[in-house]
Amino acid sequence: HRYNATLNDKAAEDTGRPGFENDVRLEFSNNPDHDGDGTTGYTPWDTVVCFTYKLNILKTNDHDLKLEGAKFRLYSDKELKDEVYVKKAEDDGYIVINRDTVGGSDHIGGTTHQDSVEMVSNAKGEIKIYGLDTGIYYLKETEAPTGYRPLLDPIVLNLKATFTDERNDYVKGDGATDKTLQKLETTAHIKEFFDGAYKESDVDLTTDTSEGSSNLTVINKVGKKLPVTGSSMMLLMLTAGTALVTGAFVYGKRQKKSNDEN
């Protein structure tokens, strides 16, 4: 038999260890030919444990200034069609909405939840997302703070948890130790284009397995910034424009000098 349980919003905020234990036992009839009424028996109690995780995002510029008002959405596919819906939490963070409540499954399918919102960095530049599962996510900046340009490409996050090989032999209470959830690892694949230079990098995020947390800093750099799409043409146009402006300035000086001599 399979037993399914859905975590509520409060449970989703309690990430990492000790996890959430569910105790279950089956009731059965002692008479296989009976319709279920009368004497019954029970299987021994069985305990299972599950874990959720959180992502701590810090939005800054390259001078460590915390940026308020950056907007993000989270997706489970690279085409950015399957949004991971979130709603506001009590502590100014965001809680993942289970797709089961909108006719989907996990992070796929279903309709937009009535409480879903876009994530926005607070006055401290922070965004906290609770209730994440392991897997690959795409974090898309939809709007940058005033004076900055948003990241053109989503940040690809990969949350990986290492569990004991004997997870089916779970002992009640072991979720609070490293016997079950042994390690949490998260990587971020980031694409950058800044001052004419394109860069792709894979970053190992700082994690806390006990808290089930991963820490990501998203930086908006101060300076000239060109989009990756069509960047060569844009760079050529800007260079040519600079040359034309410089030429006009030199021509203007020469014209002025000629008039003065006359």
Question: Could you describe each region identified by the protein language model?
Answer:
Residues 1-262:
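Solvent-exposed loop/turn and edge beta-strand elements of beta-rich ligand-binding domains
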